[in-house]
Amino acid sequence: MVSKDKSAKYGSKEGYDADVMIDSKAMLSKEDFVATGVLTYALGDIIEVELPEYDVFALGDKCKMTVYTKSGLFVMDTTVVAKERGSLIVLNPPENRRKFTEKREFPRVDVKNEGLLFGLQDKNKKLKHQFETPMRFSIKNLSINGLGFTINENVMLEKVIQKNSQLEVELILGFLVPCTMEIVRQEKTNDGYYYGASFISIPEEKTNALRGFILKNQIETYFVQKRENETKKALEKKSAANQ
């Protein structure tokens, strides 16, 4: 049972580190079935649980999960959103996320998409510039609160786009997301310029689609990295055995 002192920390700025759940025993239950496994990953909206009975669960299943950590017991309602041999990916609900602090508030995923820049203005909205032809840029990474992007060599943009500039853009993610964002970082690269930006406004009806896009890419990236790590370990083990 969690003590009052620990409970008081839930949801506070000084909450538990999210890593406290890693390698903890986790119990997943649905209807009349209960399975026990190990929580192996937790970042942002997703949690991975490795368990032998993974195949009993289907995508979209509603479950109750109990996590037994050294800092206390955590119980949450969740949904299965992905599965691979030996493991399930379930949603980390907002009410559970608020109990923890994370190194990055919103997970950032690497992507290979594009966007269009229509216009920009300075933070005080005194200097405005609209492009006759929208300028295409390459999105390199994306999170629910911002993105990193590059624009090929363009001397004019170097002078116009500065830190705190506000941009009117449209993200092309398989669906269109019109939004405004503010430049928070700028650096010269070999191919042009890299910018980091935070979102100022996104249409409410596009927010869930954007979150779903990021979630899908986060899951896919995680599984790819996990397979690569498992292959690397297997090769190292084989190499050590042959020596």
Predicted feature residues:
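Structured alpha-helical
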Residues: 1-243
